[in-house]
Amino acid sequence: LDETSRPDVAQWRQKGADSLATGSITRLADGRWDVRFRLWDVVKGQDLGGQGFAVTTGDLRLVAHRIADYIYEKLTGEKGIFSTRIAYVTKAGAHYRLWIADADGENAQSALSSPEPIISPAWAPNGTQLAYVSFESRKPVVYVHDVASGHRRLLANFRGSNSAPAWSPDGRRLAVTLSRDGGSQL
């Protein structure tokens, strides 16, 4: 089945399917790939839409994630996360690394390497910045990392603890926990 054919929904319904994705991938004359898909509601017999993309070989994974996001949103009503990125910290021996990767763990890139702990990575809602806590100064300090440029800026380095960065929903503000005067405060 490709995206131009209407599937036999009765047959798929008998097999217990609720939905069906059909598609095709074709090599174009310029070396790119034409990727197309269509989603079907097998129960109602409805076409739920589809998309087409012309991409390079290097972008095939990204397109697969976009297709998965589209299908997930159509079936659940919630945005998919397949095209998003994750941030995580690893520790090897006495060395810590802050990593940024695709949601499936592929394309991991090291954002920071330190002999001191790195904790609490928190994405800005638009995915362009990442706040985290680093102990490079032998105390917790909050930084914001710009994903595109790789540059970071110091956000909170007050006396006491600076921790738990959390972005506002609009991404314009960042709340942090401080203990400047003995007790923890936001």
Language model features with spans:
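C-terminal/domain-edge helix-coil "capping" segments
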Residues: 29-30, 43-110
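Multi-bladed beta-propeller domains
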Residues: 102-119, 145-163
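Short, solvent-exposed, polar/charged sequence segments at loop or secondary-structure edges
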Residues: 1-34
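Hydrophobic beta-strand positions in blades of beta-propellers and related beta-sheet-rich domains
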Residues: 37-39, 86, 98-100, 142-144, ...
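Hydrophobic beta-strand positions that form the internal "hydrophobic ladder"
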Residues: 86, 127-131, 171-175
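Residue-level detector of Asp-centered blade-edge/turn motifs that repeat once per structural unit
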Residues: 80-82, 125-126, 169-170
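A flexible loop/linker signature enriched in serine peptidases of the S9 family
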Residues: 79, 90-97, 113-116, 133-142, ...
